[in-house]
Amino acid sequence: MSRVFIVDLEAVETRYTSEWKEHLPNQLQQTLVSDTLILAEVDEISGGDTPQATTPGAFLNFGGTNVYKSNQLMQIGEMFCKGEVQDGDYFLYTDAWNPTVIQLKYMAELLGIKIQIGGMWHAGSYDPADFLGRLIGDADWCRHAERSMFACYDQNFFASNFHIEMFGKALGTADVATDYWINTLKNRGKIVRCGWPMEYEEIQMTPYKGMDKRNLILFPHRVAPEKQPDIFRDLAEQLPEYEFVMCQEQGYSKNDYHNALGEAKVVFSANTQETLGISWYEGALVDTIPIVPDRLSYKEMGIEEFKYPSEWTVDFDKYMEHRDEVVELVRDRVENHTKYLPLINKQVTVLKDDFFSGKELYKTIKHCIGY
């Protein structure tokens, strides 16, 4: 029997990574059962405990993540030494930006063990607004590392077409045209557009649906330059009659955060970096109106009524030019919240079916192990 090994991303309690650690193994295992027959066993390769304090403004701890990944590599190496990795096994990296995939490929190739590997891409230096993109940019060592990791994966999973196109344009070269990266490799199954495995969100958010709403507008993002918190702070000054809260600054627990989503009328984004966006989906599940720019992944994910023109918040200067329009947009959504409830339901359906369901991910893995 084949085995599926989840090489996970370290869990931070306030991030979705802790939820994936709890839910993904069970969700994946349920899809690998046919009647009473187990098609494959799911095992996790965890790197142990990790610092809960992320590097300021970042998604994870830049030091701790390397300790975590090194521990994972040690376990993988020991598995090969003990003969525990077999033909037909599948390794799923829940964060594709993990250099240990190169050593995994090295061991499998040299030992003649026929495995397949999938990686879920979130961000990298190819995104100029991401932490790596801002601090490292197009440094040769980083771009070549990303190309190498991409090559190691048999399936590269992306949650949005926007992400695929950005990846291909940045990592394509003069001799490897962009259309090859995006179209040819997509047709061959090397690139797979699929929703993230977050079916649990709807159940998880149910207790917070139906809460009494108040005139609360949330900034649910990391406080980082690519999320443009200064625009949100200025909006708060323009609309003093409403309550504006930057969630990360409150030190919320996950439950506190979900309660805030349940009570809020609006979730606001002026992001210049987003390859999926989870918080606005969580908000929509509890009838909180998303206000998002018509750019990035929002462009393909959002229905028209919840997107505003991208130029309004491309940067702070453009925001100042269009501040009156943004202020009126926020005021309308707060004052007429109930009018938008049917549209919120429509938005939830789009997001749930196409972007926050792991069905295509599971289907791909199932096919790779022969079912």
Predicted regions, residues:
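Active-site proximal beta-strand in glycosyltransferases
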Residues: 90-96, 108-131
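Conserved donor-binding/catalytic core segment of Leloir-type glycosyltransferases
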Residues: 198-227, 233-237
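Short hydrophobic beta-strand element within catalytic cores of glycosyltransferases
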Residues: 289-292, 299
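N-terminal pre-catalytic "stem/leader" segment of glycosyltransferase-like enzymes
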Residues: 1-103, 371
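Aromatic "clamp/platform" in nucleotide-sugar-dependent glycosyltransferases that forms part
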Residues: 271-272
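Donor nucleotide-sugar binding/catalytic pocket of nucleotide-sugar-dependent glycosyltransferases
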Residues: 151-205
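Membrane-proximal helix-turn-helix segments that form the acceptor-binding/catalytic region
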Residues: 135-156
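A charged, aromatic-enriched C-terminal amphipathic alpha-helix characteristic of glycosyltransferases
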Residues: 313-371
